[in-house]
């Protein structure tokens, strides 16, 4: 049941609180613009939501949030576990400003064994299905590819695409070097290949000793039958497997699947390091840095006045915190930081595991605050999920290594942030841009890419909060111009990019004018919130002049326009900055910190533009002829490409081969053949 408070009525907390039930559920806070501020769960909605408005000593972070609340929505659930699941889904979908957020990494890599007659071993990202076998997830692409190399060396499973497999007439190089048994040409029977697949699967599941024992029995059986060549082949396979196991002896333990989670806080940031053990093999780790946690951690590290502030800093009930003697402020700060780390661990476990595969054991550096979370994970996984807080033996070594790696990753991040912030400051000073908070500095950079006028694309990349924001990158297909006219392309992309922003600001100003508010002030405020502070153009005086004309036509400030004229060979240090407002061109030199930022942004814009252009060009060249075929739609075209591996294979196919494709009749095959020849 969802209970919204209408946004067009004055916000009256007492009236809303009086209507809330004493039931479990999820609550959502909104500001005046309708943006979600916070999503939380509660065992008792009335008590939990009321605590935000009845306590007098809130932390600055929570107090600031409460002042911005303009609307409350609640959803009643049947249990606290159900509320936890709904809360996690809403946090991922809405990304509230005051919730601890982790990047939703849905594309964890897996090792896949396909459901083919001769299963293919492949690196895979995406959602899993029940048709194929999936092993993982793995912490990195490297871990998957290393496992594939091991399986190739020991079990010699195929890795080629089905379209290549179906068209082989002789073994490939992998067979010649002993990395594939060549099922494509019948060099191995179905039964023997199936045994290899089974052994590979058991190896990935941590049952290496079982596989080794069976191979030994198989070798002795061949020897007893005087089949010495087959026995030697199995012996070589055992030798390869023994080598792999020896190399991994330092990593192999008694556990099959374990995840190790270490949380470290320092310098206003938090790092969660996730190490994965799959099949008894330590596959490496990955560091995560949550957002929206900095303010809470700063409060914790700086000391919090009393228990209520400490509790609210991590959004926990005040009465859940221990009583601390007044003479132990150091302990208060330590406990506050630990509470934030526990809250971060809770958020990570919920956002990372709910809806995904969960190993049977989680080794953690901090005890999570929510007991319901573990119960929900066990229910979802279909097996008990154990949480180990104080591990022993090998697990303890793994946790210690994960904590050390978390500290190293956090120190590296803080160091990089410091140097990057210094470079941003140097750039702002070089361009005479005054700003109290450089984290708000937004830079957009444009580049044009094409091949002799073909497949022209423009790119726009964004630099904000001292780093590149890849989620805000945009590509623009350039049409209606003379091929190769970079000036016309630059005019088109700048007009398309900023014309809408100017229109939005004008509409907001007109609405305020009608309401009796100063529309010009609104227009300026709206424009400043939408537009970048600096616009970089990859080009010299000609491109900058075109940009100046566009900005003048749109009524925008031309002083924000800066051209980056590349030096000889695009070498960093030889660039010249060209200004649209008439300032003298500036050469920064190789040692300039400001130039490092400019070169980083410019090179990223060039990379983004050229990759898009190449993809567009390749698509046009590879599929244009098939798209022009009469009687061949998208599905038939896809089947042809899958069957023959590309346009070249389709062109080389005979009428009979074309007719063997599903959905292609003999008459249509003849028609296709005639159109392609």
UniProtKB/Swiss-Prot annotation:
Domain UVR per the UniProt entry, residue ranges? 209-244
Is the keyword Ribosomal protein in the record? no
Arranged from A to Z, the UniProt key words for this protein are: Cytoplasm, DNA damage, DNA excision, DNA repair, Excision nuclease, SOS response
Q: Which residues form the GIY-YIG domain?
A: 22-100
PROSITE patterns in UniProt: GIY_YIG, UVR, UVRC
Relate the assembly described in the record: Interacts with UvrB in an incision complex.
UniProt lists the family membership as follows: Belongs to the UvrC family.
Give the PANTHER family listed for this entry: UVRABC SYSTEM PROTEIN C, UVRC/OXIDOREDUCTASE
Q: What does this protein do?
A: The UvrABC repair system catalyzes the recognition and processing of DNA lesions. UvrC both incises the 5' and 3' sides of the lesion. The N-terminal half is responsible for the 3' incision and the C-terminal half is responsible for the 5' incision.
Give the protein name, as stated in the record: UvrABC system protein C
Q: What is the lineage of its organism?
A: Bacteria, Pseudomonadati, Pseudomonadota, Betaproteobacteria, Burkholderiales
């Amino acid at each position: 049941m969802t209970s919204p408070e209408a946004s067009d009525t004055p916000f009256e907390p007492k009236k809303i609180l009086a209507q809330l039930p004493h039931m479990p559920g999820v609550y959502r806070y909104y500001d005046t613009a309708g943006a979600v501020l916070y999503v939380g769960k509660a065992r008792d909605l009335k008590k939990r939501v009321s605590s935000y408005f009845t306590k007098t000593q809130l932390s600055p972070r929570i107090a600031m949030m409460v002042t911005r609340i303009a609307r409350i929505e609640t959803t009643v659930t049947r249990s606290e576990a159900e509320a936890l699941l709904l809360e996690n889904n809403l946090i991922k979908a809405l990304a509230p400003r005051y919730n601890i957020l982790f990047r939703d990494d849905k594309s964890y890599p897996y090792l896949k064994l396909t459901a083919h007659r001769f299963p293919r071993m492949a690196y895979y990202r995406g959602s899993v299905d029940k048709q194929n076998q999936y092993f993982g997830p793995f912490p990195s692409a490297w871990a998957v590819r290393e496992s594939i190399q091991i399986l190739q060396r020991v079990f010699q499973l195929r890795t080629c695409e089905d379209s290549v497999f179906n068209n082989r007439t002789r073994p490939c190089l992998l067979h010649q070097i002993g990395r594939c048994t060549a099922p494509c040409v019948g060099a191995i029977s179905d039964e023997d290949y199936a045994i290899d697949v089974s052994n590979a699967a058991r190896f990935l599941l941590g049952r290496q000793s079982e596989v080794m024992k069976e191979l030994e029995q198989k070798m002795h059986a061949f020897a007893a039958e005087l089949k010495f060549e087959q026995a030697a082949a199995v012996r070589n396979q055992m030798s390869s497997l023994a080598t792999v196991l020896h190399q991994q002896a330092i990593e192999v333990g008694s556990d099959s699947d374990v995840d190790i989670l270490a949380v470290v806080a320092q310098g206003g940031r938090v790092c969660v390091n996730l190490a994965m053990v799959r099949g008894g093999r330590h596959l490496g780790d990955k560091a995560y840095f949550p957002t929206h946690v900095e303010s809470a951690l700063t409060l914790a590290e700086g000391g919090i006045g009393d228990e209520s502030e400490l509790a609210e800093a991590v959004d926990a009930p005040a009465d859940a915190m221990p009583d601390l003697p007044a003479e132990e402020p150091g302990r208060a700060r330590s406990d506050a930081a630990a509470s934030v780390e526990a809250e971060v661990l809770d958020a990570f476990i919920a956002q990372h595991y709910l809806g995904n595969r969960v190993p049977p054991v989680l080794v953690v550096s901090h005890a999570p605050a929510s007991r319901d979370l573990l119960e929900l994970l066990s229910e979802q996984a279909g097996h008990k999920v154990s949480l180990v807080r104080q591990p022993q033996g090998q697990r303890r070594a793994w946790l210690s290594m994960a904590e050390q790696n978390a500290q190293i990753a956090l120190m590296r991040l803080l160091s990089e942030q410091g140097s990057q912030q210094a470079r941003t400051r140097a750039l702002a000073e070089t361009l005479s841009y005054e700003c109290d908070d450089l984290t708000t500095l937004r830079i957009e950079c444009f580049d044009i890419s094409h091949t002799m006028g073909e497949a022209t694309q423009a790119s726009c990349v964004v630099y904000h909060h001292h780093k590149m924001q890849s989620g805000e990158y945009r590509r623009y297909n350039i049409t209606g111009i003379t091929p190769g006219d970079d000036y016309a392309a630059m005019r088109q992309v700048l007009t398309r990019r900023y014309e809408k922003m100017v229109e939005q600001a004008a509409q907001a100003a007109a609405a305020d004018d009608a309401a009796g508010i100063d529309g010009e002030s609104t227009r300026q405020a709206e424009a400043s919130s939408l537009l970048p502070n600096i616009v970089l153009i990859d080009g010299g005086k000609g491109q900058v002049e075109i940009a100046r004309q566009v900005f003048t036509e749109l009524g925008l400030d031309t002083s924000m326009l800066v051209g980056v004229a590349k030096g000889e060979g695009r070498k960093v240090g030889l660039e010249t900055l060209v200004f649209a407002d008439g300032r003298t061109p500036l050469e920064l030199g190789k040692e300039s910190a400001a130039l490092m930022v400019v070169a980083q942004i410019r090179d990223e814009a060039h990379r983004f533009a050229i990759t898009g252009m190449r993809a567009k060009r390749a698509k046009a060249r590879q599929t244009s002829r098939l798209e022009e075929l009469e009687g061949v739609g998208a599905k038939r075209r896809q089947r042809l490409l899958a069957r023959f591996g590309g346009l070249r294979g389709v062109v080389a196919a005979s009428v009979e081969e074309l007719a063997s494709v599903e959905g292609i009749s003999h008459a249509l095959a003849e028609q296709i053949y005639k159109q392609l020849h």
